[in-house]
Structure formats: structure tokens, C-alpha cells
């Protein structure tokens, strides 16, 4: 089981779709060697060094957290049903209301659209909020994603810089 890493007062909570088998096996988020999450958040400015999956709890030192829409591990995210994503979206709203981070970053357009019953999402900041928490949709850093490392870092850096501008 991959546990959430959450606390009150975070700058951002990154929300993956669901754990892959590597993460489920180790208990650490974004654990597959091909997953670029740790490299991307470092290069985008969220951390001052590249953390390893087993150091995930140190995200809290940087006022960052991690959660997921669906707890069930799969080989690929497309094995998760629309119903699971929708139910996960409802649970996620409750978590975000409890912890009230400055931003929630959903990693993937389809995850956002299905989890929050939205259509036509664009990358970046969304008009929908959860209380005062901004919602951002960022490309998924999975090794299966065709988005380049450069584009991932650019998208995540936009969120980091927006939070800096807000004084967070």
C-alpha cells in the first residue's frame, strides 16, 4: 500500500492516478525507475535536490505532499475505470478540504476530467477550486507518457513560480 504524504499548510499536493506495481511493491510513490516525478519536481524548483522514492516523506520538508485518485495498483493507469476515478475524485475533495494546500496538481488531463466530471481541460491552472486551493492539471511524469522531460519541467515550473508569486 502506498500511503498519502499529507499535512496541513502545504504549498502543493501532487495527485497521481494510482500506484503502479513498483510503487505498490515498495510502498513508495512514483517508484518505477522510468517514472520522472522525482527528477521533474527537483528540476522545476520544488526541492533543492533530487529525492529518491524511499525519501518521499522528505517532501513535507519542502511543503509538498503526494496522494492518488485510486488506491488500487495496476500495470498501466488505463486499467482504472471511470467509476473508480469518479469515486476517487470525491474522496480527494474531502482530503483537500481537510488539509487545504495552496494548490492541488492533478497529474493527467483524463484523470482530472474523469475524477472531477470536467470536459475539455487544458494544462495549467483550472477555474475550478476546492475552497481556496487552486487546481492545476499537469502532465503525468510516468515513463509511459510521451511528454518530454523538458516539457514536464516547464509545466511543473509554471506551478512553482505561480506559488512563489502568491507568496507561498
Curated annotation (Swiss-Prot):
Q: Which Pfam families match?
A: UDG
Protein name, entry field: G/U mismatch-specific DNA glycosylase
Q: Cross-referenced SUPFAM superfamilies, in alphabetical order? A: Uracil-DNA glycosylase-like
**Which keywords annotate this record?**
Cytoplasm, DNA damage, DNA excision, DNA repair, DNA-binding, Hydrolase
Q: Which family does it belong to?
A: Belongs to the uracil-DNA glycosylase (UDG) superfamily. TDG/mug family.
Q: Name one GO biological process term.
A: base-excision repair, AP site formation
The subunit field of the Swiss-Prot or TrEMBL record says: Binds DNA as a monomer.
Stored InterPro entries? MUG/TDG (IPR015637), MUG_bact (IPR023502), Uracil-DNA_glycosylase-like (IPR005122), Uracil-DNA_glycosylase-like_sf (IPR036895)
Catalysed reaction(s) here are: Specifically hydrolyzes mismatched double-stranded DNA and polynucleotides, releasing free uracil
Q: Which gene encodes it?
A: mug
The UniProt note on how this protein's activity is regulated states:
Subject to strong product inhibition. N-glycosyl hydrolysis proceeds 100-fold faster than product release.
Which GO-annotated molecular functions does the record name? Answer: DNA binding; pyrimidine-specific mismatch base pair DNA N-glycosylase activity; uracil DNA N-glycosylase activity
In the induction comment, the record states: Induced in stationary phase.
Lineage runs: Bacteria, Pseudomonadati, Pseudomonadota, Gammaproteobacteria, Enterobacterales
